[in-house]
């Protein structure tokens, strides 16, 4: 029995059913200050397609979201509405008794699947809803999502995953074998997280639209607050990139780590040449050097620029693409996204694939709500899957956290484990009232 042996608790859960839902198109005008600007996306308005699951319990709700950068957010909202109907009338216990059935219910509808499958707008919507159910389940238990997962046995963890299309790389039995050694020492690792936090890197200083003066000022401020890993956006103009990377390296010092992010703008030969020009600044990795779908292109780039690593994954649709990237050697840093993948279930699958191929997971964040999501993923990876955060850092950007009820807590450049129940993405009433998008306006 997945939910445990406490019969009375199971009865309580069985009494809680999903009775309805409400959706919101939330958009923040980040393009005004060029926050989030890069070579591919020069003027993003960070946005959330947000869903609230209502239940038969007056005080129990589930909150989920997926992230976009403005126009098109309404498409995700429409897809959420189409899929959410599949949850109405379902009990929380029925959905979570075998969590893989939740994933398949929302990704395998016999007609909606046609506009995927397991990719694009429909998968972003599925992620918002799957995450909302996990949020709801965790709130019922009065625990954060990371704690709910970290209390699972290896068998329960593996039972969350849809292994269809993965068994040539990872079987359920192999997953359990990977997890079993990590079931020892979990309490000590959790204590370490409460003491030290989980290491992060920041993109807050490196947006492409920032002036050199702004870059210096923000880098100095972040360095003083404890950050040692800095990412800078590149790819628009080589001479501009050379100057900006020089400015960042001067400001951050020789002992800090630099990462560069091209946001998919280069062809493969262009990427190789451009990265070689930037190599003197010693980037630890280059992110999204070409099309996010070009697995063999990433493989060619990785071979040409070694020992600089290739990082990708924020637009990797699903576990199957990640499997192929890892099998091919096309990535050396896995940047999974908690609402690009199909929610918690598929995030857990990709974590185990990465462990199987000995590839560090450094989740993508930065957009509204993403930092709040990924802190849970990184904690789970450390406590349950790998037992280390050596060579692992989770992305962080210092904006829009005031719009969620339980924002991330950073200390000395590290994520501190969230204590509030749920998945940390409940928006404030002020955010819903002040930033809900209406096309008439």
List each language-model region with its residue ranges.
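Metal- or metallocofactor-binding catalytic centers and their adjacent structured scaffolds
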Residues: 54-167
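N-terminal small/glycine-rich loop or linker at the start of catalytic domains
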Residues: 183-210, 306
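Active-site mouth loops of central-metabolism enzymes
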Residues: 197-215, 234-235, 263-267, 311
């Amino acid at each position: 029995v997945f939910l445990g042996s406490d019969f009375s608790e199971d009865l309580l859960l069985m009494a809680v059913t999903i009775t309805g839902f409400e959706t919101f198109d939330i958009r923040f005008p980040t393009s005004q200050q060029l926050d989030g600007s890069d070579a591919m996306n020069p003027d993003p308005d960070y946005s959330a397609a947000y869903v609230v699951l209502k239940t038969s319990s007056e005080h129990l709700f589930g909150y989920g979201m997926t992230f976009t950068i403005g126009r098109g957010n309404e498409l995700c909202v429409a897809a959420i509405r189409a899929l959410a109907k599949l949850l109405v009338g379902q009990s929380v216990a029925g959905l979570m008794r075998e969590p893989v059935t939740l994933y398949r219910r929302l990704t395998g509808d016999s007609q909606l699947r046609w506009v995927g499958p397991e990719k694009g707008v429909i998968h972003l919507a599925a992620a918002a809803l799957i995450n909302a159910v996990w949020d709801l389940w965790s709130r019922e238990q009065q625990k954060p999502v990371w704690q709910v997962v970290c209390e699972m046995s290896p068998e329960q963890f593996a039972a969350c995953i849809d292994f269809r299309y993965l068994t040539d790389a990872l079987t359920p039995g192999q997953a359990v074998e990977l997890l079993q050694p990590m079931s020892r020492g979990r309490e000590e690792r959790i204590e370490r997280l409460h003491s030290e936090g989980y290491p992060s890197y920041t993109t807050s200083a490196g947006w492409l639209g920032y002036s050199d003066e702004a870059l210096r000022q923000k880098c100095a401020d972040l360095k003083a607050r404890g950050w040692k890993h800095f990412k800078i956006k590149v790819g628009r103009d080589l001479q501009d990139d050379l100057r900006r990377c020089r400015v960042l390296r001067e400001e951050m010092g020789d002992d800090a780590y630099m990462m560069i992010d091209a946001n998919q703008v280069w062809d493969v030969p262009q990427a190789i040449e451009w990265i070689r020009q930037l190599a003197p600044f010693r980037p630890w990795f280059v992110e999204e050097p070409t099309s996010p779908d070009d697995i063999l292109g990433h493989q060619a780039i990785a071979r040409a620029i070694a020992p600089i690593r290739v990082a990708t994954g924020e637009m990797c649709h699903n576990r199957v693409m990640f499997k192929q990237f890892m099998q091919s050697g096309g990535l050396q840093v896995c940047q999974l996204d908690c609402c690009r993948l199909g929610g918690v279930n598929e995030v857990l699958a990709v974590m185990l694939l990465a462990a199987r191929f000995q590839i560090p997971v450094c989740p993508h964040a930065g957009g509204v709500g993403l930092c709040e999501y990924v802190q849970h993923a990184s904690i789970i990876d450390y406590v349950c899957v790998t037992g280390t955060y050596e060579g692992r850092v989770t992305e962080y950007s210092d904006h829009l956290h005031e719009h969620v009820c339980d924002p991330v807590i950073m200390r000395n450049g590290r994520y501190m484990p969230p204590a509030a129940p749920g998945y940390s993405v409940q928006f404030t009433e002020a955010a819903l009232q002040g930033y809900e998008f209406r096309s008439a306006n």
